[in-house]
Amino acid sequence: MGTIHLFRKPQRSFFGKLLQEFRLVAADRRSWKILLFGAINLTCTGFLLMWCSSTNSIALTAYTYLTIFDLFSLITCLVSYWVMMRKPSPAYSFGFERLEVLAVFASTVLAQLGALFILKESAERFLEQPEIHTGRLLVGTFVALSFNLFTMLSIRNKPFAYVSEAASTSWLQEHVADLSRSLCGIIPGLSSIFLPRMNPFVLIDLAGAFALCITYMLIEINNYFAVDTASAIAIALMTFGTMYPMSVYSGKVLLQTTPPHVIGQLDKLIREVSTLDGVLEVRNEHFWTLGFGSLAGSVHVRIRRDANEQMVLAHVTNRLYTLVSTLTVQIFKDDWIRPALLSGPVAANVLNFTDHHVIPMPPLKGTDDSNPVTSTPTKPSSPPPEFSFNTPGKNVSPVILLNTQTRPYGLGLNHGHAPYSSVLNQGLGVPGIGATQGFRTGFTNIPSRYGTNNRIGQPRP
């Protein structure tokens, strides 16, 4: 019977563990500002959804989805603070940095799904355009714009700030950059404002508000309700185009790929490591992105037998640590050159295979220090046998070795005449011509037909 625990601790549910971690984050004063903005975001989102229903404007609904995306960005910021508080565990030896990447990926994908929903609703509205009420359309636009800009500029969101700079530019940023260059050519003083790469979130907030203002004016002047649907499609396309590069970048990080902009630097460092003193070969190198701005990697280094392991390890780590923050280096020492062994077809003039033995070699290392599997000194830091280099495998052909020890003819294994006269063409296997001596190969189980025959006229021992 197993051990009976009288006072077993109750297992917490998923929501209980989530509440415990939320309390851990809420105890930090840095998260109070984020929680305050989150509460304001929920209030503004509730009012905006009511105004979307009263105005019947799908363009305002598409712009409200950007406010919901701001809520996701605040949650991502809380996750970032939680990752900073948590330490690596045995189950997660690399830490919890990938949760930031997962939060960014989920937020951008949800924003793109919202944009696709707006496109689907807009396609239905083109068939039957409803009437749009402009009572709270302009008010909702300025409320959403003010809150979005205030949130993006007040909260330092490290994950999204890194992704917005590292990901490729969206088509909206490229078009705005072209317009900025043309404008700065006319007014050079604006180059410090428009020429740097604009924040994609601020850019889409301003572009969406501009589209809603045009919608309001056209509906008020000409009662042109179809412009609301056109503005919704424009906002959805801008949202999708802005979020897509970020989702692609964060998805590649989740797939543990190597960033393209560091591949050349890593190749240069690997070549430098291969030229270090004592290093014979660098193999099985693998580098991937662990989190935003942090690389992890592993590499196997084969060194000379007389090289200092600690010195080589220090030099390799010093070279690669400039790019790879989490590095695993496995050091292997080169094997001694083994003596050449006879393998393959046997010459016809070899008559007695029992006169072969293993060539005696002087001991190179003590038997206590060697590993019989790999012929490598056994030490606590040595690799397992399956990782040793140039280790004979199980596919080695049988080996016949010289042996000076003589064996008597006929060991009582008389099973009749041996059927291999076609192999030895010198008459050794034919009765009456000569004695056929026993064979000893690298195999331990000798078939019964490889027996011995008696000499003619010689009594058996």
From Swiss-Prot:
Region feature Disordered, mapped onto this chain: 362-393
Topological type in the membrane: Multi-pass membrane protein
Low complexity bias: start-end ranges: 370-379
GO terms under cellular component: Golgi apparatus; trans-Golgi network membrane
Subunit field text: Heterodimer with SLC30A5; form a functional zinc ion transmembrane transporter.
Keywords: Golgi apparatus, Ion transport, Membrane, Transmembrane, Transmembrane helix, Transport, Zinc, Zinc transport
UniProt topological domain (Cytoplasmic) ranges: 1-33, 86-98, 156-200, 245-461
Localisation: Golgi apparatus, trans-Golgi network membrane
Residues exposed to the Extracellular side: 55-64, 120-134, 222-223
Function of the molecule: Has probably no intrinsic transporter activity but together with SLC30A5 forms a functional zinc ion:proton antiporter heterodimer, mediating zinc entry into the lumen of organelles along the secretory pathway. As part of that zinc ion:proton antiporter, contributes to zinc ion homeostasis within the early secretory pathway and regulates the activation and folding of enzymes like alkaline phosphatases and enzymes involved in phosphatidylinositol glycan anchor biosynthesis.
UniProt-recorded Gene Ontology molecular function terms: zinc ion transmembrane transporter activity
Pfam (any one): Cation_efflux
Recorded family membership: Belongs to the cation diffusion facilitator (CDF) transporter (TC 2.A.4) family. SLC30A subfamily.
Lineage: Eukaryota, Metazoa, Chordata, Craniata, Vertebrata
Listed transmembrane segments: 34-54, 65-85, 99-119, 135-155, 201-221, 224-244
Biological source species: Bos taurus
GO biological process terms held by the UniProt record: regulation of zinc ion transport; zinc ion import into Golgi lumen; zinc ion transport
Listed name of the protein: Zinc transporter 6
InterPro entries (UniProt xref): Cation_efflux (IPR002524), Cation_efflux_TMD_sf (IPR027469), CDF_SLC30A (IPR052005)
